[in-house]
């Protein structure tokens, strides 16, 4: 956000505000929600909006010098799915076979249980790398190896989540560090590095990073 008159950066700490959620009044306010609704993912919008008609603080308040104060808001509409390049061997390079459908990933695998954590890059992004102290914006799907039952998924709603890397399962954190934004990964975690009851199969899209909130 910039001051429309001076060009001064107004965003707190000079950082963009990362908003994760629906394009509605609660998340963005009525005016910005109206502007972004219907726009395509990947778009950048430049929006000028008035704040008041008060005179600038350094200009005498006369009828001829009265200025409209306002701000210029730059909005990047981030993708809600990984946008990287397909890896040379999407399937066959690890224990998981993954098919993507509109409702989310479908995972199959053989009988051989992985002896440790595994990572298969399904899509390789070209964005910034994930750092150890980041928050990350992700779509994810988690199922049990033994029964294949879905345990958690953001694909149910299509709305990504912002999570703190330091609060993820201990086995998952090191597998995400240095991965690039835009990547889609197929991961397996053994019980002692996950929730303790079963090996987990995880599909995760890395959509954005931000300094930890």
Question: Could you say what each language-model-derived stretch is?
Answer:
Residues 1-213:
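Cross-family detector of peptidyl-prolyl cis-trans isomerase
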């Amino acid at each position: 956000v910039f001051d429309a008159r001076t060009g001064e950066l107004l965003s707190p700490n000079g950082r963009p505000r990362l908003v994760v959620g629906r394009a509605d009044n609660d998340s963005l306010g009525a005016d910005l929600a109206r502007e972004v609704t219907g726009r395509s993912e990947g778009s950048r919008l430049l929006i000028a909006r008035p704040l008041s008609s008060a005179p600038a603080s350094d200009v005498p308040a006369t009828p001829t010098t009265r200025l409209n104060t306002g701000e210029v808001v730059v909005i990047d509409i981030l993708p809600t799915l990984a946008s990287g390049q397909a890896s040379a061997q999407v399937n066959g390079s690890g224990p998981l076979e993954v098919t993507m459908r509109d409702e989310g990933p479908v995972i199959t695998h053989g009988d051989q249980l992985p002896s440790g954590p595994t990572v298969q890059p399904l899509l390789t992004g070209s964005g910034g790398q994930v750092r150890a102290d980041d928050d990350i914006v992700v779509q994810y799907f988690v199922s049990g190896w033994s029964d294949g039952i879905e345990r958690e998924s953001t694909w149910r709603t299509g709305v990504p989540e912002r999570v703190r890397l330091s609060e993820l399962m201990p086995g998952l954190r090191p597998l995400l560090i240095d991965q690039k934004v835009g990547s889609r990964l197929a991961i397996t975690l053994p019980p002692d590095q996950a929730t303790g009851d079963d090996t987990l199969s995880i599909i995760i899209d890395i959509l954005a990073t931000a300094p930890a909130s």
